Amino acid sequence: MGQKVHPRGFRLGLSADWQAKWFNEKNYKEWLLEDEEIRKFIKNRYYHAGISEIYVERPDAERINITVKTARPGIIIGRKGAEITSLREELERKFNRRVVINIEEIKTPELDAQLVAESIASRIEKRASYKVAMKRAIMNAMRKGAQGIKVMVAGRLGGAEIARREWYLRGRLPLQKLKAIIDYGTATAWTKYGTIGIKVWIYKGDADI
């Protein structure tokens, strides 16, 4: 039986980048837990901001550089930068280090796999048809220039007694091609019948490597 490889981990250093850019043998465990806490804190605080990825860089032991990729930068920045200043000060108090926050706007959220997965999850939680939500996401991605997209949902679909999985594929999805730029995202929809898992793969073309 074939084993699945994470699309991002398979391409690290080629067409994908690391979400954490630091190494410290002595404090590795502490810093790793801090990274996860930072990501969870920002995601929970700005869950309506369309946050896709949060990168953490540590130039030294006293500084943390955070880059947030979001579809709605205005929510995080706030009026005249008040919100981002408040966030920075709170993180500095929490972790006792100097924090620098950079915001990167996602120009085309329809081509961001994480945002697409979260959008489908949100529609399912609002009792929309999972088939309609999947097909709409695929149509929007292809219209915006995706070369291929696959969406898979698993769970008690439509309130069925037995859990199952369904998927739709449009275009090409060369998962074994190292230079293929494949974005991957996951999300969970919480329904009264239980959880429904969503996975999204988007093929955006090939990297020059």
From Swiss-Prot:
The protein's name: Small ribosomal subunit protein uS3
Function: Binds the lower part of the 30S subunit head. Binds mRNA in the 70S ribosome, positioning it for translation.
Taxonomic placement: Bacteria, Thermotogati, Thermotogota, Thermotogae, Thermotogales
Top-rank taxon: Bacteria
Subunit-level organization: Part of the 30S ribosomal subunit. Forms a tight complex with proteins S10 and S14.
Cellular component, GO annotation: cytosolic small ribosomal subunit
GO molecular function list: mRNA binding; rRNA binding; structural constituent of ribosome
Keyword RNA-binding tagged: yes
Gene3D superfamilies xref list: 3.30.300.20, Ribosomal protein S3, C-terminal domain
Alphabetic keyword roster: Ribonucleoprotein, Ribosomal protein, RNA-binding, rRNA-binding
RNA-binding as UniProt keyword: yes
SMART domains cross-referenced by the UniProt entry: KH
Organism: Thermotoga petrophila (strain ATCC BAA-488 / DSM 13995 / JCM 10881 / RKU-1)
Domain KH type-2: 38-107
Any one biological process term the GO annotation gives: translation
InterPro entries: KH_dom (IPR004087), KH_dom-like_a/b (IPR015946), KH_dom_type_2 (IPR004044), KH_sf_prok-type (IPR009019), Ribosomal_S3_C_sf (IPR036419), Ribosomal_uS3_bac-typ (IPR005704), Ribosomal_uS3_C (IPR001351), Ribosomal_uS3_CS (IPR018280)
Family: Belongs to the universal ribosomal protein uS3 family.
